[in-house]
From Swiss-Prot:
Belongs to the ROT1 family. Keywords: Endoplasmic reticulum, Glycoprotein, Membrane, Signal, Transmembrane, Transmembrane helix. This is Protein rot1. It is a single-pass type I membrane protein. Residues 1-17 form the signal peptide. GO terms for molecular function: unfolded protein binding. Residues 18-214 are lumenal. GO terms for biological process: 'de novo' protein folding. Required for normal levels of the cell wall 1,6-beta-glucan. Involved in a protein folding machinery chaperoning proteins acting in various physiological processes including cell wall synthesis and lysis of autophagic bodies.
Amino acid sequence: MIVGYLLLNFLVAVVRASSVAELVGTWTTKSRTVVTGPDFYDPIDDKLLEPSLTGISYSFTADGYYEQAYYRAVSNPTTPSCPKGIMLWQHGKYAVMPDGSIQLTPIAVDGRQLVSDPCSKEVAMYTRYNQTEAFSSFTVSIDSYHHVKRLDLKAFDETPMPPMYLIFKPPQMLPTTTLNPVSSETGKSKRHIARDIGSPVGVDTLMRSDHIGDPGRWLWFGIFMTAMGGIALIYS
């Protein structure tokens, strides 16, 4: 019985190790324009950089670090020709659980969100963003059409995420340490974060989406992420 127990634990460890190995790299949706790393977020100037098309990207390292980049068009029911834009960036640590789920825990002070409504405002709201995330399962396979590695994630509620394709291995990421430390004296970041900025998100870009998923579903996704994101508005 003891031998059987040890063998079971060994097999579980092997499965988890191979699962982590399969995740390693940078994955992006089919537009291939949204990619984690310095092309999406500039930590020196503290700004998000607009890609030419919308999309999603995740990067994973073998030692448990991750980074994510989102650029989504959110449908506007009153003015369909004028969608809103949401850009998100986070990084932190992840863990693959024994049941195959993935738990992502971001560095709370580093996450950023940019919300833009180019048809109604000439400015966009740039805020700190902190949202833990969980995927119920993941699958890595060779895509039958593109003939490259493909990552399929399912959200915590089993909703399939848009498929992503391996674009870099090793992953393209920013440093995995805290990029925007908080001052212990004031409790504020060295650079205040809540501010209106000139909107970098254009209507043409938002209309040229990569057509991954139903816009109506992404509307509710955007509302959920904005409402539940633990956004901190830190004023100087």
